A protein has these predicted regions:
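Membrane-interface motif at the C-terminal end of an N-terminal transmembrane signal
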Residues: 17-34
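Catalytic and substrate-binding regions of cell-wall glycan-acting enzymes that process beta-1,4-linked
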Residues: 96, 107, 136-167
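Active-site/pore-lining binding-face segments in mid-to-C-terminal subdomains
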Residues: 118, 122-147
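N-terminal Sec-pathway targeting helices
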Residues: 1-16
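Residue-level detector of well-ordered alpha-helical segments, enriched
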Residues: 69-74, 88-89, 129, 133
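Export/targeting segments at the very N-terminus of extracytoplasmic proteins
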Residues: 32-84, 106-125
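Active-site-proximal beta-strand/loop segments in catalytic clefts of secreted hydrolases
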Residues: 77-82, 93, 136-138
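Short, surface-exposed glycine/acidic/tryptophan-bearing loops
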Residues: 83-105, 152-156
């Protein structure tokens, strides 16, 4: 039993750290926009064709929440979460009251963008950095609270400590 708990804790720590790492790698060297003004085609983003299919809808939905400048982060999250596959490409409907038939990519994107916008607002209010927001997308909004009283900036060690506190 102790070994199973250890494995679960390790996975709780490693997966979100992996998610943040992949998002960071995907965004390294990415300019804010390509030459034609399109952040989806900016060099280095490495999006699958499936994720690119959702780019316009993600951008439109982000604009509705006044977070259009975070479109590339949302697309990177989708790429890491599912590669754009399935009815929940943002992995945002797991705890929703929707039936499997009601879960659609558009509902997933709407829920994810709304959640990301809320996380951005919370981080802004508490003075936390964008990396904390990205990590909180996976860990939950409580990670921003946790970060806000521990230096306000996401670090690898902070995310490990947070994950360990949940085991």
């Amino acid at each position: 039993m102790k070994r199973v708990k250890w494995i679960i804790c390790a996975l709780c720590i490693l997966f979100p750290v992996f998610l943040l790492f992949i998002c960071g790698v995907m965004l390294i060297g990415v300019s804010d926009e390509s030459e034609d003004g399109d952040p989806v085609h900016a060099s280095g983003l490495g999006l699958s064709d499936k994720v690119r299919e959702y780019a316009a809808f993600v951008g439109d939905t982000a604009a509705e929440y006044n977070i259009h400048e975070y479109e590339k982060y949302l697309l990177a999250i989708m790429m890491v979460e599912t590669g754009g596959e399935g009815n929940d490409p943002m992995q945002s409907l797991g705890n929703s009251s929707l039936t499997e038939e009601e879960k659609t990519p558009s509902e997933s994107i709407k829920a994810a963008v709304a959640y990301f916008a809320m996380l951005l607002q919370k981080a802004d209010t508490l003075g936390c950095d964008l990396d904390a927001v990205i990590q909180a997308y996976n860990y939950g909004a409580g990670y921003i609270d946790y970060t806000s009283v521990r230096g306000k900036a996401h670090t690898f060690q902070l995310s490990c400590d947070f994950a360990s506190s949940k085991c």
